[in-house]
């Protein structure tokens, strides 16, 4: 096997000759340089993973830690120079602040003495005798570890080694496993210092960790909804399409209503004091505005395209007939979903470890502080690029596999005898020859996605700094341009993958050939394909709507302690990727079928010498659709001619 890249098509005289569209048996590796680049990129990701394992400590974020470097709820290793470190805290799972009503921040560090305790004091303790009694009865020692409970009332150092009196009643909260004071005045001071002055990245990571079970449950909900949508499209009827569109409309309106209701609830809540709550309120307003705009656009499109429902049902029935030639195509997304879940879990674990990476430094008094390591922010950015590029690569592999299977089944003369194992055959061709092409296509998508994220971040930053309307307008225009480019590249990539599956050419050659042949035959199927893609997109919107609604209801209960807007965005992103990985089966099959149809028209004429590969049902469907489009075009021209020939009347004043 010679991996030399793409072939150039030239005649014997050296002049370019016309592309011969035929599925290739003998292939060459394509875009190998891009595959090598992806390998180098993943070498960097593996280095970051190893570094996060060595330097990170996600447990400190998840379980909390005391002032001496001990992680609560765990058995710890000693820190050199800290005599009270290295203790077994297996039974002491809660973080207790000895001066919870008067926390202070000096520089970037929280000036506090914290201990790991087995229980939080649920009643106020007014004297050292009560602190001693609480320790003897509950086994929860609220003074520094070096002081025995017997000496709480006898040692002259007890005042400095025990909590400031009175000790307010407190209750353990799942986030950080901290003992949170319950008296109103202490709670307000405690929360404003502890939560508002924590680094934003750590607050986000803590929100993700505290809601990890909810996030996982919502991903499972997105999986169930995606499966339901996939089987709806598999056995689609006109009635199901009407029910489906009604559900989409109700879902959009319902989510918009809930978001505006939550914003109204926040604005009328006089108890909001934390920055996290204010951030949540701003994010809810942003979500509400964006969802309202999307809802309005989609409702207009649904109203305009409502008359094409019958053609859509026929289109999906033809698609299902193609899928029946390779029925295991419907199970391909399960493998994609499993790989995506594994990668996302690994990515989040590394992110948490990076967020907690720090070097232990012993301060005076034997206390331990963790200083952030240099370069962590750059690693976090590199890690984020890895999330986008690798996720797109996994989804692109699925698109290439499905396109290859459709190509194999389409270019088969014996329709009653489909080829054996088309999916495995397509997967093997992808793995051995065309991984570089998929890497290049996914890289182009990532190059557009990353600036979109940066523009969105800068737009939010400008909004907070109250910059002028012109700058915000320019950023919105940039975001819209990147969005349009992203959608165009997605469509171009899909057709390029199908062309690579047919001809075995590299990405750029395939994209150019696909663009030429689709432009030449666009009159046959552009409107049908666009409406089919629109219906599939509505299916993805339905999955995201109901998943986000579940997230709103779940996260809103803990809104006082979480920056839940970011976990909700993460849930929406994962829900869309899950829905896309499942429903894109139909989208990929549709695009591949129409490209194969265009190739069939280009290379055959339906005669006995050059018969079409397509079946009669597909051909008659395209003809009916073209007649409908031509009739509407003629009707529009006729109405325009009538308007042009209308006699001008005098203006009566």
Curated annotation (Swiss-Prot):
Keywords: Glycoprotein, Membrane, Transmembrane, Transmembrane helix. The keyword Glycoprotein applies. It is a multi-pass membrane protein. Belongs to the CTL (choline transporter-like) family. Residues 632-653 are annotated as: Disordered. Glycans are attached at residues 136, 151, 412, 503, 521. It comes from Homo sapiens. GO terms for biological process: phosphatidylcholine biosynthetic process; transmembrane transport. One of its GO terms (molecular function) is choline transmembrane transporter activity. The chain crosses the membrane at residues 34-54, 213-233, 243-263, 284-304, 334-354, 384-404, 534-554, 563-583. Its main location: membrane. One of its GO terms (cellular component) is membrane. Residues 634-644 have a biased composition (Basic and acidic residues). InterPro entries: Choline_transptr-like. It is found in: Membrane. Pfam families: Choline_transpo. This is Choline transporter-like protein 3.
């Amino acid at each position: 096997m010679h991996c030399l890249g793409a072939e150039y098509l030239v005649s014997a005289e050296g002049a370019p000759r016309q592309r011969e569209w035929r599925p290739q048996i003998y292939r060459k590796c394509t875009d190998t340089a891009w595959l090598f680049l992806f390998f180098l990129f993943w070498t960097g990701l593996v280095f970051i993973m190893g570094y996060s394992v060595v330097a990170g400590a996600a447990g400190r974020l998840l379980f909390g830690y005391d002032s001496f470097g001990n992680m609560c709820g765990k058995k710890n290793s000693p820190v050199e120079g800290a005599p009270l470190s290295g203790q077994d805290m297996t039974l002491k799972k809660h973080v207790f602040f000895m001066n919870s009503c008067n926390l202070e921040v000096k520089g970037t560090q929280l000036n506090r003495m914290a201990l790991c305790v087995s229980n939080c004091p649920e009643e106020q303790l007014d004297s050292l005798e009560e602190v001693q009694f609480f320790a003897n009865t509950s086994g929860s020692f609220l003074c520094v570890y070096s002081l025995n409970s017997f000496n709480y009332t006898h040692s002259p150092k007890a005042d400095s080694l025990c909590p400031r009196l009175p000790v307010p009643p407190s209750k353990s909260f799942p986030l950080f496993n901290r003992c949170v004071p319950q008296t109103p005045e202490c709670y307000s001071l405690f929360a404003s210092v502890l939560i508002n002055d924590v680094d934003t990245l750590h607050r986000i990571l803590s929100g993700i960790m505290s809601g990890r079970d909810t996030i996982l449950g919502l991903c499972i909900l997105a999986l169930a909804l995606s499966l339901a949508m996939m089987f709806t499209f598999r056995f689609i009827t006109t009635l199901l399409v009407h029910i489906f569109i009604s559900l989409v409309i109700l879902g959009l309106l319902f989510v918009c209503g809930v978001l505006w209701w939550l914003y109204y609830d926040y604005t009328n809540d006089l108890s909001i004091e934390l920055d996290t709550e204010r951030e949540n309120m701003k994010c809810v307003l942003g979500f509400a505005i964006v969802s309202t705009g999307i809802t309005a656009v989609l409702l207009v499109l649904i109203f305009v395209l409502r008359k094409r429902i019958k053609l859509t049902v026929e289109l999906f029935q033809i698609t299902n007939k193609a899928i029946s030639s390779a029925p295991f195509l419907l199970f391909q997304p399960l493998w994609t979903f499993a790989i995506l879940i594994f990668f996302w879990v690994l990515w989040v674990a590394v992110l948490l470890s990076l967020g907690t990476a720090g070097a232990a430094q012993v301060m005076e008094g034997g206390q331990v502080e963790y200083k952030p390591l240099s370069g962590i922010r750059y690693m976090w950015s590199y890690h984020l690029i890895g999330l986008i590029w690798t996720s797109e690569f996994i989804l692109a592999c699925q698109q290439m596999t499905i396109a290859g299977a459709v190509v194999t089944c389409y270019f088969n003369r014996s329709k009653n005898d489909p080829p054996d194992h088309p999916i495995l055959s397509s997967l093997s061709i992808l793995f051995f020859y065309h991984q570089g092409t998929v890497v290049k296509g996914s890289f182009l998508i990532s190059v557009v996605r990353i600036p979109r994220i940066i523009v969105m971040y800068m737009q939010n930053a400008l909004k907070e700094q109250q910059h002028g309307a012109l700058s915000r307008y320019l950023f919105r225009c940039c975001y819209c341009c990147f969005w349009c480019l992203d959608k165009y590249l997605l469509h171009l990539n899909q057709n390029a993958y199908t062309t690579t599956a047919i001809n075995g050419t590299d990405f750029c050659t395939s994209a150019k050939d696909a663009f030429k042949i689709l432009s030449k035959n666009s009159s046959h199927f552009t409107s049908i394909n666009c409406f089919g893609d629109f219906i599939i997109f509505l299916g993805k919107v339905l999955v995201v709507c109901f998943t986000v609604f579940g997230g709103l209801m779940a996260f809103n209960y803990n809104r006082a302690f979480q920056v839940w807007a970011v976990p909700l965005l993460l849930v929406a992103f994962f829900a869309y990727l899950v829905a896309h990985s499942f429903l894109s089966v139909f989208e990929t099959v549709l695009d591949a079928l129409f490209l194969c149809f265009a190739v069939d028209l280009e290379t055959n004429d339906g005669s006995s010498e050059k018969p079409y590969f397509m079946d009669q049902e597909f051909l008659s469907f395209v003809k009916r659709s073209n007649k409908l489009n031509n009739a509407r075009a003629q009707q529009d021209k006729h109405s325009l001619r009538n308007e042009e020939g209308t006699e001008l009347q005098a203006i009566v004043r």
